[in-house]
Amino acid sequence: MRTDAVFAVVVVAIASSLTLAGCHKRISVQHVDPNGPVEVVIPEHGAYTGAFIDFGEEEEDVTLEMIEDFETIVGKHQAIIASSSYWGEQDFPTANLKVIWLHGSLPLVFWSPWDRPYEQNRGPDKFNLNDIIAGKWDVYIDKWADAARDFGHPLIVVFANEMNGDWFPWSGIYYGGDEWIPQSRSWKGPENFKAAYRHVVDRVRGRGATNIKWMFHTNNYSYPLDTWNFAPSYYPGPDYVDWLGLSVYGQQFKDEPWANIPSLVDWPYEEMCRLDPKKPIMIAEWATGEFPHSGPKGEWIKQGLELFRTRYPRIKAAVYWHERWQNPDQSYSNLRVNSSVESLNAYRAGLANPAWLGNLILRAIPRSTAK
């Protein structure tokens, strides 16, 4: 394992001067030490590329070898590496995040209030939102926050993603759903989620973990597709969100229909843009399976990598979900970029565009404000 951070293009202007005289320009750029207090800059032009790389059942078996192998396959360093931290493990993934940061990538952590056996469609478990709101898990939250603070480097954290679906135990359908609350003029399911989200963020910030940027991460379309369950109902407010995130999946199972990128992104993207006029948007998960009789995966990937940067200008990062699994009917869902030669070639070609940034842009933070 490397002992020094390997940021290939992390030199960014912390103090740049630009003078123009006729056709002459002079730019002075000061080097940024990634081991010092820094923050990740949202790119004005282009977008970061990233991946989740099939890190095991609990999505946390991060290794440098897996990251480097993936980068060799796709032909570009990854600016963002995603992994999970399930509450059932009751720990903070310090070792994983060190591997990612020392490799020169930004950790994206899905912090999920989920207990073993980590199966979907089972309903709430011991980490239910009501207990979180009541403070039952404050000791764990505080310890996690302390470890995040002590990690000391930037990371993005998602608390309870895809809450507008019906598959995770924190989904709004389990917490009152469409029951109307006259006092708040809102629905009980989303209100309970927002209360839990704010409680968690407040406690983490209260422990001094200012190196965390928070992402509000929804599924592109809501299930059920009812007004009460639309993403805006769950939005905890601009003070609690730094990034807006979307999951965008094409066909994952053999009996699902094929769908192109505009049909998956157009309306959800506009919905996110209306939530906040300025916050950056991330395609926090995107992938499709290899189903040649349904549609061409290579063309789907090509379309995604083109349109994310041209049709949707507020998208500033996209994280591919590189995973393969076997279903109960013995069929496979192969979302990996190299599920076929055509798929891999499309991904490599799209990622080769310089607008897809494989290296982080960093800005130094004065030590007085980095505490």
Where are these regions (language model features)?
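C-terminal motif of bacterial Sec signal peptides marking the signal peptidase cleavage site
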Residues: L20-G22
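Alpha-helical scaffolding within the catalytic cores
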Residues: D33-G36, D61-F70, Q90-K98, D142-K143, ...
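N-terminal substrate-binding region of glycoside hydrolase catalytic domains
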Residues: P37-V139, T288-F291, V319-Y320
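Substrate-binding cleft of secreted/luminal carbohydrate-active enzymes
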Residues: V38-E57, L155, P280-K371
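Conserved, mostly hydrophobic/aromatic
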Residues: I81, V157, D242-L244, A318
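Glycoside hydrolase catalytic-domain groove-lining segments
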Residues: A95-S112, Y240-P292
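Substrate-binding cleft of extracellular glycoside hydrolase catalytic domains
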Residues: N96-I212, L335, I365-T369
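Aromatic-lined carbohydrate-recognition surfaces of secreted/lumenal glycan-active proteins
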Residues: A160, Y197-N229, K278-F291, V319-E323
